[in-house]
Every structure is written in structure tokens, then in C-alpha cells.
């Protein structure tokens, strides 16, 4: 089972090395997308079979397997875009047919070509593929304040949709460089815009883009023709303010929008940071915040540990707008919000947590912990903050101890904190 995977650009007259030309002349079966066939069709042998690469890919792989069943020594020559090992079809072949022999003949990938057109060094560029993929890796790059981000798009994650998401969460200190039909001398277009300009623009497919923070542009003296700076879209006087500050280690409580302005309805910043430490989030992958209220714990976790998947639960519907407002204010995209009674929430489609914080339980702590245990990973932990005050009728620490005993959970020694004039707080933690 042998594949030759040949990378091509959008040029209607592709150039191939003599070795590749010989493979094409001798080839018997070819494969690729419709666009690839339109480009290379004139160079293929007459009446050569062509296997279209379309979804579902399982049908494509069945045709490949059928070919090798009858012609085991006859290779399939596959055409793919750019570098087939760069988020490309050669990767897919390796995963599906690990025993296959694969030879790759790459050309420049689309982001390399765009960087070349912009005369932009790209050794420091973070690559994110949104082609058939969700937002998390892109969000992570934004939160980490990456200076240069190369993005592979699709028809859902368009330049306009990407720009709108960035504006919504306050990451508007980037310029966007969009390349369309790269490699096609008749259709190729490279455009540099502000995010605000991009939101109302449509671009032809295929396209890709490179995002560069404004201060990065200044620092690199990037003043290529057609850039945001060259067109005067950015005032040079704004050089020192057109970028986010480093995300703080601890957001001031007063900066959050609160539930009905009630300052006691938020986990205070020092307690919040100690809570995140107790959750061991650097080693975790999925964090659940049950009873998020203002969203302060979820947002702090999102900013400090952007690799996490975060699911936030709250029974009060008015808190949905509050967490959304706070998430946008602090640049924390990607928190999965669930409104309703946690005990009635269907958890089957959610990622299994390995860290859970219970910020509110409404007197149903035992039931909540029992439900959490049905999905908590084997190495997971649960953390809760307990406060004992004259006006607080429910003894959360006692409920916690009883629940841990009934559910056979191993408790860590509690951490007792007294903050300013507030009542003592205990940070409680348990594991399976």
C-alpha cells in the first residue's frame, strides 16, 4: 500500500519537479479534491481514474482499500493543498493507514505564501487551524497575547467571524492580513485591514490570514505597502497604548459586574487564587464551576490556565448576562455556560471534569457531589469554600464532611483564611 502525496498551490499551471512529472506520467490512479482535479487534470494520463476526496472520508478510504485489494503494487497518487503534512491530507492518511508507505512532495503552505507576500518573518508565528475545528486553540492564543497568529479558516470561521470574536472580547489591538487564492496569479489577493474593517468584508475561498499585534508591527518596522500603518489606519501616536497589558494574576473584585451589586456574592480575589491553587489546574484539562454567579472563578481560571476546557453552571438565569459581560470585559472567551438546576442538567454530552469547584449548592451539597462523582475522572478533585457566620444557617463544612464520608472521598486538610473584616473561610478539598 503506497501513496505519493503531491502538494500544489492554486496556480492553474503548476510546476512539478522532473521526479514528480515522471510519477504523474506513470500513474494509474489519482485522487484529490475537485479543485485539485481542475488544476492538474490537463497533466494526467487520458482516462486515468480519479477518486474524489469528499466527506465522509470513510467512503474515500473504502475506494482506496478496494484499489489495493486488486492492485496491491500499484500506488495511488494524491494531490493536496500546499504542504500535505501541514494540517494536510498526508496526516489523515497516516492516521487511517499507519502501515502504508507514504512519500510526500510538498510545496509552500498557504500561511508561508501569505508571509512571503507580506515580507513578514514567520519563525515566531503561532499556527491555529479553524478548518473544521472549534475555537479553543484560537482563544488560547489570544489569551496568551501571542504577537503573531497564523489562522487556517473555513466557511464558518471566516475572517469576519474571527474579527468579530476578537472585538467582542477586547482583542482589537491586532491588524489582519488576509490572503485569497494564494498561488493563483489571476485571482490572488492580499489585503491588510483593521479588525473593524474586516467585520463587514467578505472574502473568497480558499483564504487564510495572519494576525499581528499592533505593537509587534511597530517593533518589527513592518511597513510593507498596503499595511494598516501604510494606509494610515493606525495613528502612530497610539503605539504605546494599542496593546493589552499582561493579564493580571488576580483580577480586582471591584472590576467585576456583580449580581444586584452585592459584593458578598463573589469569591474574593485572594480566596479565588488560593482556590485555583487547590484545584491544581495546571495539571488538569477540564474544569467545572458549579454555581458561578458572577463568573469570577471561571474567568480567573480561563486567563491563568488557557489550556483548560471550562464548563460553568448556574441556576439563576440573570447570571448568564453577568458572566458574559465579565468574560468580555476581561478577555476570557470560550467558557461553556449552562443555566438551570445542576441536578437536572444532562451531563452526558459534556467533557468529563478532572477539577470541580462548588461555589454554590443551595443546601443540596451531598446530591451535587454525588452527581459530580458519576463523571469525575479517577484523578479528579472537588474544592469548595465554606464560611461560618451568624446569618448563615447552613453549616457547609458539616455537610461537606458528611458527604465525603458517605461517598468515601479522601479529604485534604482544610485551609483556613481570614480576610479583612470578613468571617473565616475554609478551603475544602477532596479526591476519590
At which residue positions do the language-model features occur?
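Conserved beta-strand signature within the Rossmann-like core of class I S-adenosyl-L-methionine
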Residues: 379-391
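Conserved SAM-binding loop of SAM-dependent methyltransferases across substrates and taxa
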Residues: 294-306
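A short glycine-rich, Lys/Arg-flanked "PGG" loop and its adjoining helix->strand segment in the class I
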Residues: 369-381
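S-adenosyl-L-methionine
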Residues: 313-353
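Conserved class I S-adenosyl-L-methionine
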Residues: 284-293
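Class I SAM-dependent methyltransferase SAM-binding "motif I" and its flanking Rossmann-like core
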Residues: 3, 81-146, 343, 400-418, ...
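Class I S-adenosyl-L-methionine
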Residues: 1-103, 112, 307-310, 314, ...
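A contiguous loop/helix-start segment that scaffolds small-molecule binding in enzyme catalytic cores
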Residues: 2-5, 18-21, 76, 146-221, ...
